């Protein structure tokens, strides 16, 4: 297995696009690390995005919404008083993801991108009309969470955040 820790999402997309075999992204790791340790699945390439620019940030977006980085944990979201005030349903949904220990590692983006039918945060994201940013070699594009759920439009080099 090849391990990469890129400095930005453009580099992560480049690594993913040029990788041979299976690729997995690592942010919180609550699912990926379990799969690795139990030998359920070992990807050919593991891309750790925790150190990518913006991966750990919670900030206001230009449209007065919120931008939540791909590696922001549920615990970090719960502790952010302004986010909690503006998006109470989303923060409450994130609080439903696992135990306190899991919330210290689990990410909102991981909960969405894993594609589990039991993803606790997804209904709240849909209700909040949330959008995601998808990164590829061609650049970034923004799409609504609902479209993300209905269509499998990701190219091989795209990374959702």
Q: What positions do the PLM features span?
A:
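C-terminal structural segment of proteins
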Residues: 1-153
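Single conserved hydrophobic/aromatic residue that forms the stacking wall/gate
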Residues: 151-161
């Amino acid at each position: 297995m090849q391990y990469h820790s890129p400095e930005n999402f453009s580099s992560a997309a480049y690594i993913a696009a040029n990788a041979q075999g299976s690729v997995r992204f690592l942010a919180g790791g609550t699912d990926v690390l379990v799969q690795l340790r139990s030998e359920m699945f070992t990807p050919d390439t593991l891309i750790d995005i925790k150190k990518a620019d913006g991966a750990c940030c919670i900030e206001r977006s230009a449209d007065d919404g919120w931008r939540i980085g791909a590696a922001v944990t549920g615990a970090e979201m719960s502790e952010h008083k302004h986010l909690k005030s503006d998006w109470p349903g989303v923060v409450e949904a994130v609080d439903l993801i696992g135990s306190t220990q899991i919330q210290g590692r689990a990410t909102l983006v991981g909960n969405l991108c894993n594609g589990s039918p039991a993803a606790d945060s997804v209904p709240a994201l849909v209700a909040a009309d949330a959008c995601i940013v998808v990164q590829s070699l061609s650049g970034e594009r923004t799409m609504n969470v609902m479209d993300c759920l209905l269509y499998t439009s990701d190219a091989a080099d795209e990374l959702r955040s």
